[in-house]
């Protein structure tokens, strides 16, 4: 397992992947680890080097809808592993790896309203690199463990718990939660999920270290 804190190192490894076929790069990490920002930055830099060669598939686009979560009595746990359509996510990866459709339209997650939006991001057949980002990509338990077969490169974003908690707190402040609501989110959802990820993720190809 390689360790780095430089984005240029990640780009170099991606560029050194075998030239043939489409490449799926997984960027995993705890809530608020910065994985989405890293995925977006990697995508932007790669597209600067070669236009439209990269795109992003966010795991959060496969959140179950709030209506379904409420009907099942698990809305308060939104973000936990069992609140995602994992098999739908795996099927989407299978389609993208097959690369036999001119275009695959994928869902995204609108963080401003905490809702997944279907049919939002078209990925052309010509796109070579798809950066998949999400919390549970490397989890070694079924059904999440089925995803690993689709990844050509896996990256885990490693951030100290104290920094994660600070970022998460700020996130929920920006969403208008009061102190009681923030404490519940942190103690019942985000921090337990982060601990679960740390304890149950398979070894990545690269650990990206962020200490600030």
Across the structure, where does each feature detected by a protein language model lie?
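Small-molecule kinase domains that catalyze NTP-dependent phosphoryl transfer to phosphate-bearing small molecules
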Residues: 119, 145, 170-212
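Hydrophobic positions on the alpha1 helix immediately C-terminal to the Walker A/P-loop
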Residues: 38
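Extreme N-terminal, non-catalytic leader segments
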Residues: 1-26
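Conserved lysine of the Walker
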Residues: 35
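Short beta-strand-centered segment that lines the nucleotide-binding/catalytic pocket of NTP-utilizing
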Residues: 50-67
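Conserved nucleotide-sensing/catalytic segment adjacent to the nucleotide-binding pocket
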Residues: 64-113
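Walker A (P-loop) phosphate-binding loop of P-loop NTPases
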Residues: 32
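ATP-dependent NMP and nucleoside kinases share a basic, alpha-helical "lid"
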Residues: 113-171
């Amino acid at each position: 397992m390689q360790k780095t804190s430089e984005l240029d190192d990640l780009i170099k490894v991606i560029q050194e992947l075998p030239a043939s076929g489409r490449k799926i790069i997984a960027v995993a990490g705890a809530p608020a680890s910065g994985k989405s920002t890293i995925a977006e930055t990697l995508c932007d830099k790669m597209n600067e080097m070669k236009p439209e060669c990269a795109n992003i598939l966010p795991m959060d686009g496969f959140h179950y809808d709030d209506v379904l979560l409420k009907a099942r009595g698990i809305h308060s746990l939104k973000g936990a592993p069992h609140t995602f359509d994992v098999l739908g996510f795996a099927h989407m990866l299978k389609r993208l790896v097959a690369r036999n459709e001119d275009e695959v339209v994928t869902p995204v997650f609108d963080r401003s309203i905490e809702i997944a939006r279907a049919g939002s991001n078209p990925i052309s057949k010509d796109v070579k690199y798809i950066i998949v980002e999400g919390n549970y990509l490397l989890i070694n338990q079924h059904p999440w463990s089925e995803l690993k077969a689709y990844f050509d490169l896996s990256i885990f974003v490693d951030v100290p718990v104290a920094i994660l908690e600070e970022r998460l707190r700020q996130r929920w402040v920006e969403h208008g939660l009061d102190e009681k609501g923030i404490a519940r989110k942190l103690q019942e959802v985000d921090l337990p999920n982060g601990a679960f990820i740390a304890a149950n993720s398979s070894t990545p190809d690269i650990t990206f270290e962020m200490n600030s």
